[in-house]
A protein has these predicted regions:
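ABC-type nucleotide-binding domain
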Residues: 341-584
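Transmembrane helix-loop-helix hairpins at lipid-water interfaces of multipass membrane proteins
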Residues: 28-88, 165-170, 281-285
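An intracellular "coupling" helix at the cytosolic face of ABC transporter transmembrane type-1 domains
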Residues: 25-26, 117-118, 134-143, 147, ...
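Short intracellular "coupling" helices and adjacent cytoplasmic loop segments at the cytosolic face
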Residues: 2-6, 98, 106-136, 209-233, ...
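Alpha-helical transmembrane segments of multi-pass membrane proteins
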Residues: 33-34, 78-97, 148-155, 176-200, ...
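Juxtamembrane loop-to-helix connectors within ABC transporter transmembrane domains
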Residues: 12-13, 21, 89, 93-97, ...
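Helix-loop-helix
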Residues: 57-60, 64-70, 163-180, 247-320, ...
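Hydrophobic alpha-helical transmembrane segments of ABC transporter permease domains
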Residues: 33, 41, 45, 85, ...
Length: 584
């Protein structure tokens, strides 16, 4: 994401935002028609006052009750039209804004799902959450009011200029000659307000991240009695947010004060210059009255724009932060007309595979060549940082190889669709993630349209049915956020049941039992052995006693594949694997 010092050009933001109106163009057109009606209704009033005043001064006898009632009825009709138009703008216009906000949030979420693991490793979840939720809140008001307010303002300024010129050209030239001054103020303060609002958004994202971090680690916080430390961290972030708010309000105050001063000067110019013109016979009292009313309308329009400026800048800031994610490239993409990976057997080939992360040119893996047959069991062992998890992450294309290629059943995985590739691979991780919901929903997540019978059968295969049946509501038991109501072993068995239900031909076991106690590990290990039957399996192991029966064991270090062979071959070799195994 861009730093707060870098700002997208406003023209670019508007260009990217405008297409969201396309679906709602008729609503927008009607909204602008209604805006035109309200503007006309407002601008007619000074003309009526001018007419009545002129009649009162020059032809009081001609100003009959009938004429007054007709004028009153005419104005009443205008106000009814104005009220109906305002209702449409306030109701349907706001709904249009809300729909645009919804569309943008949908697009943002869809794009987030296309981004690679590296993006989420580099950006805080709290910041992302702020962008997909609070940053788009102001879009509703912005999408509704932005075209409407600027259209009304432009219309009022143009019509007012024409009418005022019709009343008195010299006075109008004086009034409008001073308008560029206000636009200079607008430009000066707008730039600074937008920077301040972006700092606010960034800081609230930091607060979200800090709160999320504390709440997710609340057990650690309580076990170390560090509530005060966390409170201090929160207070520090909260104070920084307050400071950014103060900065924003400082510029807002300067902006509003400057404009109130400008408004006062405008009235002063009209009153003094108008009075001088009047005593010299260059403008009539009725015309000066109407002129003052039009100037009042003009200044009210400018005041509305000024008041809208804060909302405008908040909206532009929200759009900018929205686009910062939308413009993040999806590193893992499908080729056009990619093939479906069908009837997968599970033969996997690594051809001269190398990999390094996008922010570091140092290879994590180099010259990896493997030929794994259907149903083979491959174990990966070695010290941390050797690339075991990275190698496994390349198979479902969580990351893409930077050198060489990987083939499944002879097909380059870059030439097949991501869905068909990932549907062929099941992953059981050490850090199990369960979604908020029931046990049934979490297991059924493994297969779209799974029946209750399917879920129960998968749970039985995973050795989870018995403990699930003993839960208060069985399969309908709510597991809590991230499965907090279940033990580590229970969560792991549910995740294994999920993979049983998916029934993939290729399986990746990423230290699936490393965080479990001995009793839970034995139960889960039995489930994993059932799951592995008939599949091509990659196992990242921390306890080497669990991989003795693997067809192939790879010992990975920072230098690549240090050793390769069966358990007995590596023991006989008395190398690194022998030393690691001897430690258990």
């Amino acid at each position: 994401m861009q730093t707060e010092e870098k700002q997208m050009k406003m023209s670019y933001l508007i260009k990217r935002f405008v297409p969201y109106f396309k679906k709602y163009k008729w609503i927008l057109i009607l909204d602008l028609i209604c805006a035109s009606l309200t503007t006309v209704c407002e601008l007619v009033f000074p003309m009526l006052v001018r007419y009545i005043t002129n009649m009162g001064i020059n032809n009081i006898a001609g100003l009959t009750v009938g004429i007054i009632l007709k004028i009153g009825l005419f104005y009443l009709i205008l106000r009814i039209i104005d009220s109906a138009a305002n209702f449409y703008m306030a109701d349907t216009g706001h709904i249009m804004g809300a729909k645009i906000e919804t569309d943008m949030r949908r697009d943002l979420f869809a794009h987030l799902e296309t981004l690679s693991h590296s993006y989420f490793a580099e950006h805080k979840v709290g910041q992302i959450m702020a962008r997909i939720t609070s940053d788009l809140f102001d879009i509703t008001e912005f999408a509704h009011h932005c075209p409407e307010e600027f259209f009304i303002a432009a219309l009022k300024i143009i019509v007012s200029f024409i009418i005022l010129c019709g009343v008195n050209v010299p006075l109008t030239v004086i009034v409008f000659a001073s308008l560029p001054l206000i636009f200079c103020f607008v430009k000066f303060f707008n730039t600074r307000m937008r920077k301040a609002f972006k700092k606010q958004r960034n800081q609230i994202g930091e607060i979200n991240s800090q709160v999320e971090d504390t709440l997710l680690g609340i057990r650690v916080v309580k076990s170390f009695a560090t509530e005060e430390l966390e409170a201090e961290k929160f207070e520090d972030g909260n104070k920084k947010f307050l400071d950014t708010k103060k900065l924003g309000y400082f510029y807002m105050a300067g902006f509003q004060t400057s404009n109130r001063a400008f408004e006062g000067v405008m009235y002063l110019i009209v009153v003094v210059a108008g009075a001088l013109f009047m005593i010299n016979g260059k403008i009539s009292p009725a015309d000066l009255t109407a002129y003052l009313l039009y100037v009042s309308t003009l200044l009210a329009t400018l005041r509305t724009i000024i008041q809208f400026t804060e909302q405008f800048q908040r909206g532009m800031t929200g759009i900018e932060r929205f686009l910062e994610i939308m413009d993040a490239p999806a590193e893992i993409t499908e080729k056009e007309n990619a093939d479906e990976l069908k009837n997968v057997q599970g033969n996997i080939t690594f051809e001269n595979v190398g990999f390094h992360y996008s922010d570091d040119d140092t290879n994590v893996l180099s010259n990896i060549n493997l030929n794994i047959k259907k149903g083979d069991s491959v174990a990966l062992v070695g010290p941390s940082g050797g690339g075991k998890t990275t190698l496994c992450n390349l198979i479902p294309r969580f990351y893409d190889v930077t050198e060489g290629r990987i083939l499944i059943d002879g097909k380059d995985i870059k030439n097949v669709t991501l869905n068909s590739l990932r549907n062929s691979i099941g992953v059981v991780q050490q850090d199990v993630y369960l979604f908020s919901g029931t046990v049934f929903e979490n297991i059924a997540y493994g297969l779209s349209g799974a029946t209750r019978e399917d879920v129960i059968n998968a749970a039985k295969l995973a050795g989870a049915h018995e403990f699930i049946s003993n839960l208060e509501n069985g399969y309908d038991t709510y597991v809590g956020e991230r499965g907090v109501k279940l033990s580590g072993g229970q969560k792991q068995r549910i995740s294994i049941a999920r993979v049983f239900l998916k029934n993939p031909p290729i399986l990746i076991l990423d230290e699936a039992t490393s965080a479990l106690d001995n009793e839970s590990e034995k139960i889960v290990q039995d489930s994993l052995e059932k799951l592995a039957k008939g599949r091509t399996v990659f196992t990242i192991a921390h306890r080497l006693t669990t991989i003795r029966n693997a067809n192939m064991i790879l010992v990975l270090t920072e230098n690549g594949i240090e050793e390769q062979g069966t358990h007995q071959e590596l023991i006989d070799k008395k190398g690194l694997y022998y030393n690691l195994y001897s430690m258990y």
